[in-house]
UniProtKB/Swiss-Prot annotation:
Domain J: 7-79
GO annotation (BP), single: protein folding
Disulfide bridge map: none
Protein name per its UniProtKB record: Co-chaperone protein HscB homolog
UniProt xrefs under PROSITE patterns: DNAJ_2 (PS50076)
Subunit organization: Interacts with HscA and stimulates its ATPase activity.
Pfam families documented for this protein: HSCB_C
Top-level taxonomy: Bacteria, Pseudomonadati, Pseudomonadota, Betaproteobacteria, Burkholderiales
Gene3D superfamilies reported in the protein's UniProt record: DnaJ domain, HscB, C-terminal domain
Native source organism of the sequence: Paraburkholderia phymatum (strain DSM 17167 / CIP 108236 / LMG 21445 / STM815)
Tree of life domain: Bacteria
GO molecular function annotation: ATPase activator activity; protein-folding chaperone binding
Length: 175
């Protein structure tokens, strides 16, 4: 069994890389979870129950991080000593800043016109852009271009926020 301090990848005996076989992650998660689930320790002493709970919590957190591609990228960068710093590093390339403004303007226009179809189309375009950017992110991470990968992660985080905003607007207009 791994240690509580091992990386999420080590916990599930997976290679430390962005490209991940999600079905292998799911299988490894079920295996580890079956070993550490607190129900297995119902008759154990308090100390063993507490340790089992720590393992179960650690396993769930690791799974959630590795299962989500954006969280996995941030985590992988943190293992490499790179802090994405999304909270205080908002500098982005000018072309992406222009794209942000266009997306925001399109959201405002479609929302003001109560045009759910336009919002749906924008969301589809955004998801397509997200797929392209995740492919680029994978290449950056695999090549060790950590600073460029960090920038790509910040951009993807912004895209996720815009997608969530569109979802909120669609929901608001549907009600």
């Amino acid at each position: 069994m791994a240690s509580l301090n091992d990386s999420h990848f080590a916990l599930f005996n997976l290679p430390e890389q962005f490209g991940l076989d999600v079905s292998a992650l799911d299988r490894a998660y079920r295996t580890v979870q079956a070993q550490v689930h607190p129900d297995r320790f119902a008759a154990a002493g308090d100390a063993q129950k507490r340790i089992a709970m720590q393992w179960a919590t650690r396993t769930n957190e690791a799974y959630q991080t590795l299962h989500d591609p954006l969280k996995r990228a941030r985590y992988l960068l943190s293992l490499r000593g790179i802090d994405v710093g999304a909270e205080n590093n908002t500098a982005m390339e000018p072309a992406f800043l222009m794209q942000q403004m266009e997306w925001r303007e399109s959201i405002e226009d479609a929302s003001a016109a109560k045009n759910v179809d336009a919002l749906d189309a924008l969301l589809t375009d955004l998801r397509d852009e997200e797929k392209v950017r995740f492919t680029k992110l994978a290449a950056l991470l695999d090549s060790g271009s950590n600073q460029a990968a960090s920038e790509a992660v910040r951009q993807l985080m912004f895209i996720e926020r815009v997608a969530a905003e569109i979802g909120t607007q669609i929901e608001r207009l549907d009600n």
